[in-house]
Amino acid sequence: LEHDKNVICEKPFVQSTTQAKELKKLADEKGLIIVEAITNLYLENFKQIQKELNKIAPIHIVNLNYTQYSSRYDAFLEGKIAPVFDPKKDGGALMDLNIYNIHLVSALFGLPDQVQYYANMQKGVDTSGILHLSYPDKQASLTASKDSYVTPRSFIEGEKGSIYFDGSTGTLDNFTVEMRNEQPKRYNLNKYPHRMAAEFNTFAQMIDQHDTQKADEAFVNTLETMQILTKAKNSMI
């Protein structure tokens, strides 16, 4: 930014809400684009999930799970600390994996009233944990794990039905809508085989057209996510 370059910043955007605001302020002052690279919010499946929410509403329970046994976990147990497990570099399950869950919940439901993170700690870092978000009308449980193995499944549960999907919340390869007393319907609307294609096509268009409005809209979600992350880290148990 200081060298007048537009910036695509890998998730998590920064370490704190304060840093996020500082970078956005600098970008705005220089008339530049700054945007967070977060795959799931730009996928066609996510956009369709947004449209399907009203069908199952009112929504009371959200369970999102991103479990991925880390390829560096065995080395971590032997004392070889990679950056993704280094607390000094904001490693750990919350910042590396639960960030995807937080982005989804923030984009779908906004900021919660209460935030509490329950972490499994090893060598000073959270290798897994559950983030609980409390809303006036719903409860959300966001699980992320780098030390366990499972095929994760996530649910959004409402009075009229549910939306659920298997696998990573970062890729959203497909999802199913199941209404009460109806047959479930499975969807996959993603256009590209690579999970990053949709977001980078959006970023290219955003930068080519200097679409600051779209960048501002993306930053709203980034800032909300950083606010939740900051509270989660401060609440860590």
Tell me the role of every PLM-derived stretch:
Residues 88-95, 185-194:
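A short glycine-threonine-serine/GTX helix/turn-capping micro-motif
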Residues 1-41:
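Beta-strand-loop-alpha-helix segment that lines the small-molecule cofactor/substrate pocket
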Residues 101-171, 200-209:
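Contiguous beta-strand/loop segments that form the cofactor/metal-binding neighborhood of enzyme cores
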Residues 154, 172-181:
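Short polybasic amphipathic segments
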Residues 188-201, 217:
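Active-site loop of classical SDR/Rossmann-like NAD(P)-dependent oxidoreductases
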Residues 43-112:
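Predominantly a Rossmann-like dinucleotide-binding segment in NAD(P)-dependent oxidoreductases
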Residues 21, 202-237:
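C-terminal helix-rich "cap/oligomerization" subdomain common to oxidoreductases
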